[in-house]
Regions:
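Beta-sandwich interaction modules
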Residues: 70, 114-126
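Solvent-exposed serine/threonine-rich low-complexity stretches and specific carbohydrate-binding patches
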Residues: 104-112
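Extended, low-complexity, turn-rich repeat/linker tracts enriched in Gly/Pro/Ser/Thr and Asp/Glu
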Residues: 84-92, 139-142
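Non-catalytic, beta-strand-enriched accessory regions in extracellular/secretory proteins
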Residues: 49-73, 77-79
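Non-cytosolic beta-sheet module surface loops
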Residues: 70-72, 82-86, 124
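Bacterial Sec-dependent N-terminal signal peptides
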Residues: 1-25
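Short, surface-exposed beta-strand/strand-loop-strand elements in extracellular ectodomains
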Residues: 87-103
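C-terminal edge strands of extracellular/lumenal beta-sandwich accessory domains
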Residues: 21-45, 95, 126-156
Length: 156
């Protein structure tokens, strides 16, 4: 009985500590402009011999990266696409390999022709997980920004 009473305060402390930590939760979003761009890009890449491996709409906060982890196979050709909300001023995507070495960095600004879309090709030098970190900066809207990520693989 004494052991149970001694263990109770420790369990309570662990519960409060775990509940107090901030956690990034993936939440989907809907934006009609982004949906049209997604449909157009899917058709374009599928026509070019790509298959869609993963896609997700994500609710983002201005100036905060949203990590996306994907397994990539050695020698395969991939196309990564990030679409940000058109009212944002800056868009970035950084990609890191398993050793946390940055292997891709792209940035677009609002005034660019295709400013809210970042797309890049990548051939994985070895089979391992990679992390993409899309980010967008919006001066007026700080929370609930809509973003969309897609990963395609070239099949022919």
């Amino acid at each position: 009985m004494k052991n149970i009473l001694a263990l109770l305060p420790i369990l309570l402390l662990l519960q409060f500590n775990a509940a107090g930590q901030d956690v990034i939760r993936l939440q989907s979003c809907t934006d009609s402009l982004i949906s049209r761009q997604v449909d157009s890009l899917k058709a374009l890449y599928e026509k070019d011999g790509h298959i869609l491996l993963k896609e997700a709409s994500i609710t983002m906060e201005s100036e905060y990266e949203m990590p996306v982890v994907v397994p990539l196979s050695q020698g395969a050709r991939y196309q990564f696409v990030f679409i940000g909300e058109y009212t944002s001023r800056l868009y970035e995507v950084r990609m890191f390999d398993w050793n946390e070495k940055q292997v891709v960095f792209q940035q677009k600004k609002w005034g660019d022709v295709d400013g809210n879309i970042i797309s890049f090709a990548y051939i994985a030098p070895q089979s391992e997980f990679h992390m993409m970190k899309p980010l967008q900066i919006n001066k007026k809207k700080k929370k609930n920004l809509c973003g969309y990520v897609m990963l395609f693989k070239k099949v022919n």
